Amino acid sequence: MSKTGPTRRLAVGIEYDGTRFAGWQQQPGLVTVQDAVQKALSNVADHPVTVTAAGRTDAGVHACAQVAHFDTQAVRPIRGWVLGANSHLPPDVSIHWGMEVDRTFHARHTAQGRSYRYCMLRQGTRPAILRDRVCWIRSPLDVEAMHEAAQALVGEHDFTSFRAVECQSTTAMRHVDTITVRGDGPLVVIEISANAYLHHMVRNIAGSLLMVGAGERPPGWIAETLAARDRTRAGVTAPASGLYLWQVRYPRSLQVPEAAFSRPWAMITGLPGESADPR
């Protein structure tokens, strides 16, 4: 018989390749990351588990550091939760860490901010291995112009021009802490840190910055588009394949682990593995 005790709350850090998933959130008849994680943890707990995530990523979007919490009466060592869940998860989803947290902790509401990275590969021929993990760009990109243009988005603004038409948020006001555009060889990465995001906000920003990088618009166009508060003035929504939930920030006192993927990222790309901390 499984050992049980008082209800406690656990947090886990999850990495996943979102290519074949219809997003994080559980949806009837669709393959989702939440469904896979809940089934795996329920097997370890020996009772149904419901997980709540820091961010609900869309179909095809990846995560290096998704954070989720769940409640359980099952008594298991942390290592048992991590390894046990991974034994029930598909190869494109992995739990890297687990920790017990206070019952007041909430993966989404306790978070102070989130960072996303949007990755573009600029080369003349389409990629094969990276086809579902980057946005392929045939033409050269002016990275400096993209970075210059992006600075107009820093601070608190109405991001109506960069929200999806179907976005259900009651307000378009969001605060962007930092946004950078960096390039190393064929790889270009947009990194944005904000308190919260609108539906498709990062991908719409990426699509607009790509127009600046390609020379189709001047850097000042981004500021003009932001001020217009009109979705039709911005660029197209960039493909989901290039987007990664990179980091979720919590109060330091909680000692939530950083992304397990940060060091391999630096080795593979030559770009910094860790984000600038705006706190």
What are these regions (language model features)?
Residues 1-279:
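Structured-RNA-binding interfaces characteristic of tRNA pseudouridine synthases
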